[in-house]
Regions:
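N-terminal periplasmic "start-of-domain" segments of outer-membrane beta-barrel proteins
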Residues: 29-63, 92, 100
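Short acidic/polar hinge/loop motifs at secondary-structure boundaries
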Residues: 92, 110-137, 448
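A beta-strand signature from Gram-negative outer-membrane beta-barrel systems
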Residues: 124-169
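Extracytoplasmic beta-strand/coil segments of soluble accessory domains associated
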Residues: 69-110, 131
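C-terminal beta-signal and adjacent terminal beta-strands/loops
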Residues: 34, 205, 426, 576-582, ...
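Membrane-embedded beta-barrel scaffold of Gram-negative outer-membrane proteins
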Residues: 283-301, 411, 418-419, 452-506, ...
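Periplasmic-side early beta-strands and strand-to-turn transitions of outer-membrane beta-barrels
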Residues: 154, 161-163, 171, 183-267, ...
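Gram-negative outer-membrane beta-barrel transporters
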Residues: 342-343, 377-383, 475, 481-484, ...
């Protein structure tokens, strides 16, 4: 069997089986175009004990999601996602008790994390570009590098296909939001093409629970345009080239509950990559990849002076912040006859960041990494698959990190299995932590170019299985996870040269412990239900309090009705969040959790061929009022700080139309 045939088989089976534990499980097919080692890495890791969940494009369309964040929020077990103020906003993410910056984001395997603050948000990734989303849980630093501490989220863009086809869709919602999108794909001989584009605009809703009179811009609006092109060429059955380019232009409000007249980010973002896959023989395959991620943002903050309402320019339009991240990698797979196969690779990253808004000196960081993994061959062991690997990283200034992991899966029977991943991961300091120079005139903390990477030890252990039930299977998985983080980077006050604090590697170990249970079951021929519950205990060294911005517990549940060959489908999803703490300097620690939201969706096909469809969705059906963030502003009358809540999405109605061709 050739390498490409093996990849296609593994990827298809594992992508479909991974769907059994999320609401993505109702999909009719998952398009997997296994054109390189990079494409099928998540699916292959699942075979060796890594937990991988998948959302398909069809599930995204059926539920009426317009951006990546909302789809992840409701669909993936164990992943807490909290958009600040609805679609296309910054998000808080916690995967198995992690911080936002502990999760690596990728587009077609290309890292898109914002290393300025180590907390990149997918706030400009529209749903139209999605073929599927793959979520890998647990330490994923071996192949993916820094920030894969708790896992990785890979957004796979529209796949190639030989037959011409595509989609056009439009929608509008009750927050004065409008969406227009489409894509097309096909092939001319050995040349394959995909093009996609989308435009989203919304006036938004009032994002805070109270405003000072000086805040005159009170609705968070957005406008986003995204275009993308993919090109693939088969030089032969064994040599393939894939090229991706995607461009995003966005204007996103960045308002406050006091003094705001105009405040926004105007962003231009480019993501480009090229991959060359070469099967030298049936046993040896190589992948060469280069990438560029260029992020340029023009920021403006114009305020009103309380009382007089005189215009005050804090940051004039054109104030710059952004970064450029480029690099390359090589990966080789050697699978000789026998019981073992080998993977070897090299990564190079060059990163430059500059911020005039949050003063960060323009510095360049380079990272070189060598990694390898040894795996048991597909049929080497009757019921088990095992893998182990090592990665060495060396960055600018001699900063080093070495990580490893060992993983495996054992099928106790056809209906019961156990799997585990044990290893280490690392997190490089952000540009802010290294090079922040402080705001002139303020008593401000400082960056520290001598910081060492954070180091973590991770264990994931799962037991799962399935039982035949009706025409499908009842599937379940119970996962326990543990993570210890050393050399945590935080602001310290021990150095007398920095009385206002300086970033340092603090003493002590942050401990994360938790468990996740997910089940999925058919309820007759047309109905399916799924549910998950996650509990996390995340503590700083010497503390008995839950770390802020990480929920103690949360749960998700969904129900779908999708009869085969019927013209009508419907779904419901529930999202419950337990105790979740935020802290402000004036008001201390507060609990903003303990809320639940319900979404409903439905769509009907207008023709026998199911090319035309109309859908409706209702987000937050009961108009639950809940906070996603806490902040404080100064009262206009000078009486001091005022606590304000940033509110989640209110009850929102959406209408959708789509045409497949």
């Amino acid at each position: 069997m050739s390498g490409s045939d093996l990849r296609r088989g593994i990827a298809t089976v594992l992508a479909l089986s991974a769907c059994h534990l999320s609401s993505a499980q109702t999909v009719e097919e998952v398009l997997v175009t296994a054109r390189s080692l990079d494409d099928t890495l998540p699916a292959e890791l699942a075979r060796y004990g890594h937990q991988v969940d998948t959302i398909s494009a069809d599930r995204v369309a059926a539920a009426g999601y317009v951006d990546v964040s909302t789809a992840l929020q409701y669909e993936i077990p164990g992943l807490f996602v909290s958009p600040g103020s609805g679609p296309y906003d910054y998000v808080d993410v916690s995967l198995q008790g992690s911080r936002t910056g502990d999760v690596l984001w990728l587009v077609d395997g290309v890292r898109i994390n914002n290393r300025i603050f180590n907390d990149t948000s997918p706030d400009t990734l529209p749903a139209n570009m999605i073929e599927r989303i793959e979520v890998l849980k647990g330490a994923e630093g071996l192949f993916y590098g820094t920030q894969g501490v708790a896992g990785a989220i890979n957004i796979v863009t529209r796949a190639f296909q030989d037959e011409p086809g595509g989609n056009v869709n439009v929608s509008l919602d009750s927050n004065e939001g409008y969406h227009l999108a489409g894509y097309g794909r096909g092939a001319l001989g050995d040349h394959k093409f995909v093009a996609y584009a989308s435009w989203d605009k919304g006036d938004g809703y009032r994002q805070f629970d109270l405003y000072q009179p000086s805040a005159t811009d009170r609705d968070r609006s957005y406008e986003i345009m995204n275009v993308g092109l993919k090109y693939g060429h088969d030089f032969s059955d064994r040599t393939r080239l894939d090229v991706l380019w995607t461009h995003t232009e966005a204007r996103l409000d960045n308002n406050s509950a006091a003094r705001t007249r105009r405040s926004y980010n105007h962003r231009n973002e480019e993501i480009a990559s090229a991959k060359l896959s070469v099967e030298v023989s049936d046993t040896f395959e190589m992948l060469f990849k280069g990438y560029l991620h260029d992020w340029d943002t023009s920021y403006a903050n114009i305020q009103n002076r309380p009382g007089t309402m005189e215009e005050v320019v804090i940051y004039p339009p054109g104030s710059y912040w952004g970064f450029k991240d480029y690099g390359g990698s090589a990966l080789a797979r050697f699978a000789p006859e026998g019981k073992l196969e080998y993977h070897l690779g090299y990564d190079y990253q060059n990163y430059t960041a500059r911020d005039e808004v949050f003063p960060i000196a323009g510095k360049t960081e380079t990272v070189h990494a060598f990694f390898g993994q040894m795996r048991t061959a597909k049929d080497a062991l009757e019921r088990a698959s095992l893998a182990g690997g090592l990665r060495y990283n060396r960055g600018s200034g001699g900063k080093e990190a070495t990580v490893w992991n060992v993983s495996g899966r054992y099928d106790i029977s056809d209906a019961l299995y156990v799997q585990s991943v044990v290893g280490t991961a690392f997190l490089l300091p952000s540009a802010e932590q290294l090079y922040y120079t402080g705001i002139a005139g303020d008593e401000d903390y400082a960056g520290n170019p001598d910081l060492e990477p954070e180091q973590s030890r991770n264990v994931n252990l799962s037991i799962g299985g399935h039982l035949p039930l009706a025409s499908n299977a009842f599937a379940w998985i119970l996962t326990g996870f543990a993570r210890d983080v050393d050399d945590l980077i935080d602001i310290g006050y021990d150095d007398p040269e920095y009385p206002n604090g300086r970033y340092e590697n603090v003493a002590g170990t942050v401990k994360v412990r938790g468990a996740e249970l997910a089940v999925s079951a058919p309820l007759g021929e047309a109905f399916r239900a799924h549910a998950s519950y996650t509990y996390t205990r995340s503590r700083d060294a010497g503390s008995d309090e839950q770390r802020v911005r990480i929920p103690v517990s949360f749960a998700k549940a969904g129900f779908t009705y999708a009869p085969e060959h019927a013209r009508f489908e419907a779904g419901a999803s529930v999202y419950w969040v337990g105790d979740t703490y935020w802290s402000t300097s004036a008001f201390g620690r507060r609990n903003i959790g303990n809320y639940a939201t319900l979404n409903l969706s439905g769509r009907t096909f207008l023709d026998q061929a199911q090319r035309h469809r109309i859908g409706v969705s209702i987000e937050n059906v009961f108009d639950e009022r809940y906070a996603t963030r806490l902040s404080q502003v100064q009262a206009d009358d000078g009486t001091g700080a005022v606590l304000v809540q940033r509110l989640g999405v209110p009850q929102t109605f959406s209408l959708h139309y789509a045409y497949d061709f």
